[in-house]
Amino acid sequence: MLNLLSQNLSLLYKEFQMLNYTPVEWLQTVIKNCMKNLHLTEIPNHVPLSDTNAQLHSIYENFTTAEQQYIHHLIQNQFKHNDALLILSYIINYLKVEGFEQDVADHVYNGDFDCFNQIMLETQLIFLNKVPPYNIMRKIHRKNISCLLANTGISFPYIPLKDRNNNKIVIITEQLLQNTNHAPTLMTLETAYALHKYFNYDIEIFTCASNRLLPTYLWSLTTGFYSYDHHHLQISYKDAVLNAIQYPLDASTLNDYREMITYIHDLNPLFVLNIGANSPIADLPHLFTTVVNFNTVTTAPISEADIFIRCTKLDNALENLYKQELSSHQQQIFIKQNFPAITNISNKSFTRKELNLPEDKFLICLVGNRLDTEVSPSFRQLICSILRLNSTIDFVVIGTVHELKEHFENTNYRDRIHYLGYCPDLLGIYRTLNLYLNPERIGGGWSSAIALRAGLPVVTLPNCDVAYNVSETFTVTNEEQMIETILQYASDKVFYNTKHQQALDFASQNEENKIIDFLSEMLTKVKEALPND
């Protein structure tokens, strides 16, 4: 009993000490925890590290603006770039403190790293909840392209349009997985198939997944794209066989990428179509041919491609920023047709009992492969608010999560949040649920489109990929309206049934053959924009 009392007093005293931290003491503790996380030094473990991090998050949020700015100043000016990035990655990934994105971008841009680490640092920025300003990201991307060119020695003369193979298109993408329920994979395969079958192009596919782990002395918790090893593939898709070569970053060398770009040069395509590849490697063919970037999300791509294919305009301020950053060789094309959200039709059905889900609850799902980083602290509070306001609601998390689960396990709502892990058959799972909720993020458009096909209404904020895929019918203006709408879904059966039918109707209009219309418009506009040389 005395030992337990002593431990509790020690915890209370430690918490009292932390509440009185100065900005310098706060940063010192962050660094100590960061070093402990790396197992570089031994620090007495009076308080579990996760608890300490939660306290550090709270302390930072309660600092004055001037105190917070002083912490930013210290990290910006008192540390070498490598050390600053390690500290910043710990603050972002473990403390879940927002507002340090610009600091990371500055150190990435001004630091001196090898090509592959630079690519992966750019990738970390892309995965942040709040991506740094577009102009900074473009500067980092250009720097990475220059690094690749300098270290590979790639140099080819420009090929005039009249000398290109008019029947050949090369596709570069980030990932091709065996699971064709994986949205980017399905999108690439469907595009390649349609270009070949309906437009008679010879198609070659290349991948360049940014999937290398950053050194632990440089970044905590590397985020990247999953990929298979470097090898040739022949992919049977519908009634066609598609050729692909994978060049994942963790299994490739600079010589491999020189080989990849040389191979594309020798294929001499009409143009290179980048489908959602963030890697600067995908921009290297711009040296000798036209690169067309179809970013697959609503924002403008971070790319040196010649032509940007976009499907929607955002607010005027953002669009003006995009225009300012266009290089002299670049132009944007807006497609009137929406790229259809193709889904593999599944007749498989589940019961809630099979999934260990409660029979008597209104089940709202969160879906994604990066929910640990996409669900911000404020959105976690929103989830708790919904659970507090309506006891008939539970949440279902679909996708692999660790930190998010740990967070909710330490709340009063641990028994009302259920975790299904990665689910290859989303359509079948959705049929057991009631609502799809989208956190503020980039991505998620495909999973929301599948939800509509299952008749699952969607709730999302505007100006994001999910909003683009589900129409204004399912968007709300802010988080307050999001909560009100969710509560109405759970309590008003007439309202719910109306939206359920609207979801089914919208999905039925978004059939697979619409990809032909989309690609027809895209090809017409790309050919009009190709250089007249």
Tell where the protein language model's regions lie, with residue ranges.
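Catalytic binding pocket for nucleotide-activated donors in carbohydrate/polymer assembly enzymes
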Residues: P439-S508
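A charged, aromatic-enriched C-terminal amphipathic alpha-helix characteristic of glycosyltransferases
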Residues: S349, S491-K527
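Short acidic alpha-helix that forms the nucleotide-activated donor recognition element
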Residues: R258-T262, Y422-N434, R453
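Conserved catalytic-core segment of nucleotide-activated headgroup transferases in glycan assembly
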Residues: H182-T191, N316, S327-N410, Y419
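Active-site-proximal region of nucleotide-activated glycan assembly enzymes
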Residues: N129-K139, F288-S346
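Acidic donor-binding loop of glycosyltransferase active sites
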Residues: L267-F271, R431-G444, L456
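N-terminal subdomain of nucleotide-sugar transferases
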Residues: M1-F63, I71-N77, D106-Y226
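Conserved active-site histidine-acidic residue motif and adjacent donor-binding/catalytic loop
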Residues: A251-L254, V401-E403, I417-Y430, G444
